[in-house]
Structures are given as C-alpha cells and as structure tokens.
Amino acid sequence: MAYAGKVVLHLRSTERQGLDSLIEDFMRDGVRFVGVVGPDCVDIEDVVDWICLGPCDGTREPYDMLTSSHDDESLEDAISFAERITGNYQGHAFGERVEVVTLG
C-alpha cells in the first residue's frame, strides 16, 4: 500500500535505523510533505532534506518534498499543520488524509 501524499513522521526515540529506506519509499510513492515531530525532530528533518537532495554525482535529480519539524509541539499539532498544506504540496488529492508513520 502506498503512503499518503502528506505524512507526519512521529519519532518515539532518537533511533534512526531504517530512516533512509523509509524516505526512499516516501519518494517512490509520491509523498509531497513530511512533518517531523518528537525527539530530535529538527535533526531528522535535515536528514530527510539531504536524502531528498540525493547524491552529488548527478545520478538522481533532487526530489521536491516540503518538510517541517515540530519541536515542542504535539502530534496533534503536527497533524493539524499538515492538514492545512495546500498547493503543490497538498498530496495526491485535495482533502487527502494525513498519514502518521511512527519510527522508533
């Protein structure tokens, strides 16, 4: 099953195992927005951005994904923020749900 166009990545720990492949899956499925909430969310947002940029050797074009981090905010706040994203980053279809993916 493909991921929704907008995802909130809910971190329960600072563990990053599997993050690279998860973001690759998001890109494969056409995810347009990822909001990150939980421990280390600011650093994890940066990692997501670097993965989307891709390798510097030109073997892949950068992937256009909007990201945000929600330090000191609740999961519900991050979901509410994601629900209000519109335009190019609104997801596959207007009004599409926000999917919460838990890591850690």
Language-model segments: residues:
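ATP-dependent carboxylate-amine ligase
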Residues: 1-104
